[in-house]
Regions:
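N-terminal domain-start signal
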Residues: 1-297
Length: 297
């Protein structure tokens, strides 16, 4: 027990230090007032992001390159937290961090599907790696090898032995039939959140209570956004809506998702689950602008 307490003390100190490095609203305003990208990056060099940007040469000062360097700071922060986390909670923290690898996997597969439209003078991997999260030694996917296959089916074969093998192998059949990555990406999302929820529920005592509340609240909003977007934009059937969402959460129940899938009024259901959201109907009138606001309400 003592080691667990000291472990939390160490990670708490580390996270508090990270909070102190966050940019203040005033700093964000000053940055947003920068006249051009070069001035913005120059200003960022005087913030905690500076050491990640200081190595950029003038001809490398592009928004994409700067964003990639800034991602390295987030990667270093996550890596530090993972390594300092108490043993019993480390699997949960690692799975949280794997969210970025999931994004990388989707980006790799999408790039393979669209590479034919790119400038042939630039190697595909050089284009793709600029948008990937720098997952470092934690990565389990052979991103470069996948991109260089130039074929989705061949890239999927390279995922054997990774945490994604069973999920992606099953969904790959539909990708081949429908010529779309949509069912595969949905399957990967669901698998990620199932595993994260399972890790939260493996914990005991106060750890479990807090993890279930935090992870469950994230899962609730994801589930709601999925079912609303699938219904509004993808026009999925009731059965598909249920299959493409999760039957558990913190406040959003399986019957809530099923009710939306069956045609119940979405706004009234949101208002019941989240009483503080009083303008759900107005937000849903224009989903394109309203859903992002609802997601962060």
């Amino acid at each position: 027990m003592a080691s667990g307490v000291s472990g939390y003390a160490a990670i708490s100190t580390r996270v508090r230090a990270m909070y102190s490095d966050l940019l203040s609203p005033q700093e964000m305003t000053r940055l947003s007032d920068s006249p051009d990208v070069s001035s913005l990056i120059s200003s960022l060099k005087n913030t905690p992001y500076g050491k990640y940007l200081s190595g950029l040469k003038d001809n490398e000062l592009t928004p994409r390159r700067a964003i990639q360097q800034i991602k390295h700071r987030l990667a270093d922060s996550y890596s530090s937290v993972v390594q300092q986390a108490p043993e019993q909670t480390r699997p949960l923290i690692k799975q949280l961090y794997r969210y970025f690898e999931l994004g990388n996997l989707k980006a790799v597969l999408r790039s393979i599907q669209t590479v034919s439209s790119w400038n042939a003078d630039t190697p595909a991997w050089d284009r793709v790696r600029e948008v990937l999260f720098p997952f470092g030694s934690f990565t389990s996917i052979p991103a470069q090898a996948m991109v260089e296959t130039g074929n989705v089916a061949s890239a999927i074969d390279l995922l054997r032995g990774t945490p994604y093998e069973s999920t992606i192998s099953f969904a790959a059949r539909r990708v081949s039939t429908e010529q779309s990555l949509f069912p595969l990406e949905v399957a990967l999302d669901l698998d990620y959140w199932r595993k994260l929820w399972a890790e939260a529920r493996k914990l005991a005592g106060k750890d479990r209570e807090m993890a279930v509340k935090i992870i469950g609240s994230l899962l609730d909003m994801n589930n709601l956004m999925w079912v609303i977007r699938y219904k509004i934009y993808h026009k999925l059937s009731e059965e598909e809506l249920i299959n493409y969402t999760l039957p558990f959460g913190y406040r959003v129940r399986d019957e809530d998702v099923r009710a939306i899938a069956a045609g119940s009024d979405i706004a009234s259901l949101i208002s019941r689950i989240y009483p503080s959201i009083t303008n759900a109907s107005a937000l849903l009138e224009n989903p394109q602008s309203g859903l992002p606001k609802l997601e962060h309400a």
